């Protein structure tokens, strides 16, 4: 599948960034635009099909690869975040991340939103919420992965992080208000997720 192929390519790029940064350096300017496009387009799809999925979307069959592993947007998001982690951990590539910090944080917070599935599960069992949200939890999710990446960025770029995070939070709060005032059922039912994710990002 297209998602599976993108995931495999991102995993390969991550290995190259970590192990042969000198060889990758001349190619980074060509690699980053399609990776960024994948991150942004996948965010729209993830929010629509996972975060705000309706009951009808629950019937979609899972796609598996040749190894029997489920190939989904979650796996693609994990691969994107691992690639960004690799850039942050490699001194040669950190300036590339720093340059687009505010926009990157905006999309990370999008991925931090509670999904309908999580909301239903946690409403029925509050103890499960406490367990899943614990930093030592064995339940790894896009929400937790997003928090991990945001923490890594703030630790690496302390000074820039404050301004970028403030801009990100304000942007999400503004868009949440616009959603709530949109007059649509989807907007009214989902705008709170933006606000919750923004508050979560503040820690």
Question: Predicted segments — roles?
Answer:
Residues 2-4, 43:
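Alpha-solenoid helical repeat architecture
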Residues 8-12:
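WD40 beta-propeller repeat blades
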Residues 22-29, 33, 37-203:
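Alpha-helical repeat/alpha-solenoid scaffolds of the HEAT/ARM/MIF4G superfamily
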């Amino acid at each position: 599948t297209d998602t599976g192929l993108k995931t495999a390519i991102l995993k390969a790029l991550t290995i190259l960034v970590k192990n042969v940064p000198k060889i990758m350096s001349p190619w980074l300017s060509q690699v980053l635009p399609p990776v960024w496009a994948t991150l942004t387009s996948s965010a729209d799809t993830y929010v629509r099909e996972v975060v705000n999925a309706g009951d009808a979307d629950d019937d979609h069959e899972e796609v598996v690869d040749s190894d029997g592993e489920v190939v989904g947007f979650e796996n693609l998001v994990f691969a994107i975040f691992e690639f960004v982690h690799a850039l942050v951990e490699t001194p040669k590539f950190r300036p590339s991340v720093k340059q687009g910090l505010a926009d990157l944080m905006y999309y990370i917070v999008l991925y931090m939103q509670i999904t309908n599935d999580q909301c239903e599960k946690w409403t029925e069992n509050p103890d499960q919420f406490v367990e899943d949200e614990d930093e030592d939890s064995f339940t790894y999710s896009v929400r937790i992965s997003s928090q991990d990446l945001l923490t890594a960025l703030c630790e690496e770029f302390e000074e820039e992080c404050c301004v970028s995070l403030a801009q990100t939070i304000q942007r999400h709060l503004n868009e949440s208000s616009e959603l709530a005032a949109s007059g649509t059922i989807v907007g009214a039912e989902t705008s709170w997720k933006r606000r919750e994710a923004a508050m979560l990002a503040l820690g």
